[in-house]
Amino acid sequence: MESSLQKLKFQDIDINLIPTAKWTTKLQYILYTWCQSILHVAMFFSDIYTCIKLLAFNTWSNNIIQPFLEFRISKWLFSGCILCSSLILIWELVIGLRVYRKKEITSNYMNGISRLINCLFNFKKYQIFELIVLTDEKKFSKWLFFSYFEISGCLRLLFGDSPRQIINGLTLWSVLLTVSNETSSGTHSTQSLGNLDDLNGIINKIKHIAKTNYEESVILSFMLFSFIIWVILISKLILSIIIFIIFIRPRFLSSKRKVKGYELKLRKYVSKVIDENLSRTVYELGILIDDEEEGTICGDNKTQKKFDYDSPDYGDESTIPSYYCYSDVETYERVYTPIKAYFPQKYKHKYI
């Protein structure tokens, strides 16, 4: 009789027993959850407005600064990128809402959309997600999380933002270089180019433009800001790919597995690490709910329950409840799995 282990859900945890968060955690919650969400929504509506102006009115949202490429080329390039980004976003929303309805902590943490929805409306769930990462002391797991989440969420960055930001960067450079050459009388153009080789020089040129054309300087400032954000994001993606190739992939594909032609998938490994961290967290904090007696199990001596089992596999007193569904009958059975089943590396028993 085969059985499948059902993962922990939010209703299995008493969120009221989660320790009070520090002010730094609350600040991170505001910045990384609410501020980023508002920024993404504003950028999305800005993209929609630009796309409508391009396709319906055959013009840019501003007529002051023209793109680096010809309008007939940049028009379809920008519109295609915006439409592609919107389609990817809709696809991610559909998958994210499906994951959100499952209420599984691990799958909700691994999906960016469902993780954001949970965090926006419940700070305690944000704390649970943070505890998953903070309780892992292994540097390899931290690099693994960084690499996985950067690579798994790179579609919109590569196909929706990168082509536009490259054109924005070239347009910004050409406008500033033109202004630099016009204002530097009696000097060679390469000397003017040298004034734009760092961020300080670019900002000074934008300040100079503001003296004669304030609206143009504002547009250039927003273009510069979005381009810097894109450079940071694409740098993180490149770093995550390098980390995956050099450090993570060799761990998955050892010499013995190469001979057998077997390779462990990244997503399954990340899910396993999150499950272990989550089990360790709820055990140490004692925040897991026992539905049968309306109390919590594990944790300190006041809430910890001991179970006696005749089987040697259940010799450890620290247990975690699991739910098994048998395929041949529609019945569920609650059993208490020992902690050593979640952390076999701490015990001498070998599990096949």
Curated annotation (Swiss-Prot):
Catalytic activity: K(+)(in) = K(+)(out)
Extracellular topological segments: 1-36, 98-227
Gene Ontology biological process terms from the UniProt entry: potassium ion transmembrane transport
Induction: Expression is strongly induced during the response to alpha-factor.
GO cellular component, one term: fungal-type vacuole
Pfam families in the cross-refs: KCH
Keywords assigned: Cell membrane, Ion transport, Membrane, Transmembrane, Transmembrane helix, Transport, Vacuole
Location relative to the cell: Cell membrane; Bud tip; Vacuole lumen
Coarse class of the protein's main subcellular location: membrane
Cytoplasmic side: 58-76, 249-352
Topology of the protein relative to the lipid bilayer: Multi-pass membrane protein
Disruption phenotype: Leads to high-affinity Ca(2+) influx system (HACS) deficiency. Causes a large increase of cell death in response to mating pheromone, when KCH1 is also deleted.
KW 4Fe-4S (keyword) present: no
Transmembrane segments: 37-57, 77-97, 228-248
Gene Ontology MF, one: potassium ion transmembrane transporter activity
Homology family: Belongs to the KCH1 low affinity K(+) transporter family.
Job description of the protein: Low affinity potassium transporter that, with KCH1, participates in high-affinity Ca(2+) influx system (HACS) activation during the response to mating pheromone. Directly promotes K(+) influx and HACS may electrochemically respond to this K(+) influx. KCH1 and PRM6/KCH2 act at the apex of the calcium signaling pathway that is used for survival during prolonged exposures to mating pheromones.
Protein name per Swiss-Prot or TrEMBL: Pheromone-regulated membrane protein 6
Gene name of the encoded protein: PRM6
